[in-house]
Amino acid sequence: VLSAADKANVKAVWEKAGGNVGKYGGEALDRTFLSFPTTKTYFPHMDLTPGSADIMAHGKKVADALTLAVGHMDDLPGALSKLSDLHAYKLRVDPVNFKLLSHCLLVTLACHLGGDFTPAAHASLDKFLSSVSTVLTSKYR
């Protein structure tokens, strides 16, 4: 459960990322594919060359979904219900991949935000991404 301090930290990090969240999402997805090549299996239809337009576009989709989640931290299941259905029933993404992408997003944000990515912000964002992952995999039964 996210505390009030966690929610404030997550909102602060997301605001600092500002208009770059789409770019950071693409970079995090790139980092995931490079670090964990098995994650590429879900994207046979995409150009997975590092920095490709396909990766950047999907990374922006990820970032947009996270922006939605940041705005609905008190009701993540409601806000992410359609995405949960998509990932569980249609795409059938292995739940471990959400953890891998979350890790790569944390690394990406740390690289870009520097001193603004404090240990407290890191911990709060990690909890937030874990909560998002839990919601996205909640229908995997």
From Swiss-Prot:
UniProt keywords (A-Z) are: Acetylation, Heme, Iron, Metal-binding, Oxygen transport, Phosphoprotein, Transport
Function field = Involved in oxygen transport from the lung to the various peripheral tissues.
Residue positions, PTM N6-acetyllysine = 16
Quick check: keyword Isomerase in the entry? Answer: no
Q: Which family does it belong to?
A: Belongs to the globin family.
Phosphoserine PTM positions read 3, 35, 102, 124, 131, 138
The protein's name: Hemoglobin subunit alpha
Tell me which Pfam families the record gives.
Answer: Globin
Q: Which GO terms describe its cellular component?
A: blood microparticle; haptoglobin-hemoglobin complex; hemoglobin complex
PANTHER family, sorted: HEMOGLOBIN FAMILY MEMBER, HEMOGLOBIN SUBUNIT ALPHA
Sites where Phosphothreonine occurs are at 108, 134, 137
Query: Tell me, how does this one assemble?
Result: Heterotetramer of two alpha chains and two beta chains. Two external cysteine residues at beta-16 and beta-52 cause reversible polymerization to octamers and most likely irreversible formation of higher polymers.
| Annotated positions of the Phosphotyrosine modification | 24
Entry comment describing in which tissues the protein is expressed: Red blood cells.
Source organism per UniProt: Echinops telfairi
Give the GO biological process terms. hydrogen peroxide catabolic process
Which residues are involved in binding O2? 58
Q: Which residues form the Globin domain?
A: 1-141
Please give the residue positions where the record annotates the modification N6-succinyllysine.
Answer: 7, 11, 16, 40
* Annotated positions binding heme b: 87
Named from the GO MF annotations, one term is:
oxygen binding
**Do the record's keywords include Transport?**
yes
